[in-house]
């Protein structure tokens, strides 16, 4: 690791985040010396898009203190970081790649040189959190090693796992114009089993690099690769360079064959324990878990853990979570383990498909129960779910809602899931910064949960991780994860399991105790899964066996959801969360029909061009049917929409717009009263971030017109904006008439 000496920690003052205290404390202090509030220490990595200064300012914005090189400490963690109102294009990729946050650092905020006389003299500096840096207890710093340095120091399974992860990032990085990041080995850092990106590097050319460029880069590591992997790796790189392996999915399948061969040289020991508690403030426990055991079974190569959280405040949340547990556990428990031989039938994609089917079955079972009991509105049962499957060195995580999964190894902590809520959706779309998005109204409201809509509109996130070292996986409901309790306590409560100073059962009890004493507002459920990896000296693998993994080459499959869905524009009737049990005004539950005209060239395929137009395809989005008490508002005015850029043309291939397609508005669009060119625009506009549905397509001589259906709140008007709020015990009808804020609720 790269070492460095930071500034004097005793000289740095860290201000208490408690708004009623804000006392200064020494950086070394864990708790505020006045009020005993935990002091979060956020060490951030500074970047300057487009330039790299030789020296960084010692203080930024009178709050960020330079500790070493480009590492800053936020001395006012209780104050929201500054961010611009509009997301600059050069850092949007960080937001849209938010679901890959265990690999890619995220934007914390922006800052400027505090010593500068003018902001114009101080170009924006962006501060990244979750960067591959780590403070040491003795005050020195280390940066995780880049892959060039680490390659020769790890075993073959680690090497193959790193390659698989880079391929897993490739497609999304290409789409966001940052594939060059993966071609710069200085930006590709490693932490045990995991790839960590230092910062994103934009592509210089509009033409995305091909997979052959990865092959050229990786071939530099052939001389430091030892048998039995060397011959396989050399041929694998050549196939990438020659184009015989031309898709990431195809290359991943070959790597998986080699991983399965090498897995016989390891023993994987999984154990799981669960614990659920009603909590101090609830009359019943709406959480559920699987398996129902505090004492772990003997270690084995495959385990299953599930946590469900009945949507708080809904009658029958405990029934919904119980139905989900019984349905999913029964279906998933019957899935066969992954093969340990490359000659066995490929099964990982099948495994993920089976999990999705199990989630759909659970959703249907809860929905049918709701219908049989004629439950409407708040009476309808719903639940979140998070599923963890350990299978040799494969970890499969699937989830719906805001129940979470975390992974802890001997060095680091990873949040593996992204909540299905409004705040995360805005970040994934590139519209908001996470630190500020979570403080917006209805930010924590769920956009999907089991039992709240048809399975055809349910989009579970299913992911696969390759873990080749001892680790702990935590699944939990938000009774524990709220207020960053896991982030605060993972070192003291979870890492000791790995050095055998505490047990799974004891750790589970401690986590429940923390949830009840430091949160206490909800039920709490945890499932702890432990993996221990030991060598298997009874088996060896030679070069010939690994070379056989290249014959025959697999055909290029359709891309699979083996990773997080990135920038998925979730458009749905929003499910209330525990903090706000209403259908928020952000939802599209109340449709508004308008006619939209784009001043476009007569090539309708260009409507959906992601790079240039204001409408972004949202065809993959879940759009549950509106509730029975919603009503469609028909406007008699015919409204056209001004184009975002009439001069824009494109040669990219895009799918034509179709009736029923959902689109995301990329920039605010001006609306007109009719299709007559001389008509002045109306006061209202469709806001950036609005999600609309194509109801009809009409063509005139020089324009295309769209009839769109949109949420009333997405029409900005001369009156005030409709924004319903409620506490957890309140239920409101969504706004029925917002065109000019007539406040009919």
Regions found by a protein language model. Name each.
Residues 2-8:
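Non-catalytic signal-transmission and effector/linker regions of two-component phosphorelay proteins
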Residues 483, 672-675, 701-707:
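Short, Lys/Arg- and Gly-enriched loop/turn segments at beta-strand edges
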Residues 208, 212, 221-222:
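Long, charge-rich alpha-helical interaction segments
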Residues 640, 682-736:
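SH3/SH3-like beta-barrel superfamily modules
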């Amino acid at each position: 690791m790269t070492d460095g000496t930071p500034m004097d920690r005793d000289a740095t003052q860290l201000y208490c985040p408690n708004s009623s205290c804000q006392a200064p404390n020494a950086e070394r202090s864990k708790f505020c010396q006045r009020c005993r509030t935990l002091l979060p220490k956020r060490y951030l990595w500074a970047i300057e898009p487009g330039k790299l200064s030789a020296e960084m300012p010692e203080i930024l914005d009178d709050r960020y203190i330079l500790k070493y090189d480009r590492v800053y400490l936020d001395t006012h963690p209780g104050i929201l970081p500054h961010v611009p109102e509009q997301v600059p294009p050069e850092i949007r990729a960080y937001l849209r790649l938010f679901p890959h946050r265990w690999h890619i650092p995220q934007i914390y905020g922006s800052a400027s040189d505090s010593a500068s006389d003018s902001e114009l003299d101080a170009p924006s500096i962006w501060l990244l959190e979750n960067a591959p840096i780590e403070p040491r207890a003795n005050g020195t710093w280390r940066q995780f090693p880049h892959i060039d340095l680490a390659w020769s120091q790890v075993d073959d399974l680690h090497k193959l796992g790193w390659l698989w992860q880079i391929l897993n990032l490739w497609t999304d990085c290409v789409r966001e114009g940052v594939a060059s990041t993966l071609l710069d080995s200085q930006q590709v850092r490693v932490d045990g089993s995991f790839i960590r990106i230092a910062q994103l590097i934009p592509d210089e050319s509009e033409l995305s690099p091909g997979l052959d460029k990865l092959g050229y880069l990786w071939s530099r590591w052939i001389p430091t690769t030892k048998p039995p992997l060397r011959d396989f790796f050399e041929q694998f790189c050549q196939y990438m360079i020659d184009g015989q392996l031309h898709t990431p999915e195809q290359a991943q399948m070959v790597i998986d064959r080699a991983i399965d061969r090498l897995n016989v040289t390891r023993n994987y020991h999984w154990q799981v324990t669960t614990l659920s508690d009603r909590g101090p403030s609830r009359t019943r426990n709406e959480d559920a878990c699987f398996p129902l055991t505090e004492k772990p079974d003997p270690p084995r190569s495959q385990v299953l853990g599930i946590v469900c959280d009945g949507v708080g405040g809904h009658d029958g949340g405990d029934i919904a979570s119980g139905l989900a547990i019984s349905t999913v556990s029964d279906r998933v428990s019957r899935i066969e383990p992954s093969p340990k031989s490359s000659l066995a039938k490929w099964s990982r994609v099948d495994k993920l498909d089976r999990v999705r089917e199990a989630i759909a079955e659970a959703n249907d079972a809860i929905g049918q129960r709701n219908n049989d009991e004629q439950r409407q509105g708040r009476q309808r049962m719903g639940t979140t779910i998070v599923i963890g499957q350990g299978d040799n060195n494969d970890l499969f995580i699937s989830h719906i809602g805001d129940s979470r999964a975390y992974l802890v190894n001997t060095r680091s902590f990873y949040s593996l899931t992204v909540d299905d809520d409004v705040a995360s959706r805005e970040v994934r779309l590139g519209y908001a910064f996470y630190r500020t998005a979570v403080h917006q109204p209805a930010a924590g409201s769920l956009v999907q949960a089991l039992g709240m809509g048809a399975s055809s509109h349910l989009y579970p996130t299913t992911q696969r991780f390759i873990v080749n070292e001892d680790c702990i996986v935590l699944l939990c409901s938000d009774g524990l994860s709220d207020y960053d309790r896991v982030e605060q306590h993972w070192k003291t409560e979870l890492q000791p399991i790995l050095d055998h100073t505490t047990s799974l059962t004891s750790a589970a009890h401690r986590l429940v105790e923390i949830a009840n004493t430091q949160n206490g507002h909800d039920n709490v459920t945890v499932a702890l899964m432990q993996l221990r990896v030991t060598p298997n000296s009874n088996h060896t693998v030679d070069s010939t066996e690994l070379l056989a993994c290249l014959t025959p080459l697999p055909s290029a499959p359709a891309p699979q959801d083996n990773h997080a869905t990135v920038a998925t524009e979730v458009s749905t009737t929003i499910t209330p969360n525990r903090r706000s049990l209403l259908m928020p005004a952000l939802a599209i539950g109340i449709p508004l029909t308008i006619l939209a005209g784009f001043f476009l060239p007569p090539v309708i395929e260009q409507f959906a061009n992601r790079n240039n137009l204001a409408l972004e395809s949202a065809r993959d989005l879940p759009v549950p049917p509106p509730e029975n008490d919603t009503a469609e508002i028909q406007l008699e005015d015919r409204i056209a929409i001004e184009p975002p850029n009439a001069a824009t043309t494109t040669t990219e291939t895009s799918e034509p717009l179709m009736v029923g397609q959902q689109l995301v508005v990329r920039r605010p669009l001006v609306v007109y009263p009719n299709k007559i060119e001389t008509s002045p625009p109306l006061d209202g506009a469709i806001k950036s971030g609005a999600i609309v549905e194509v109801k009809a397509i009409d063509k005139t001589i020089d324009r295309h017109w769209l009839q769109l259906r949109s949420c009333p709140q997405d029409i900005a008007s001369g009156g005030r904006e409709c924004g319903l709020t409620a506490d957890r015990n309140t239920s409101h009808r969504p706004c029925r008439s917002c065109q000019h804020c007539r406040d009919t609720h």
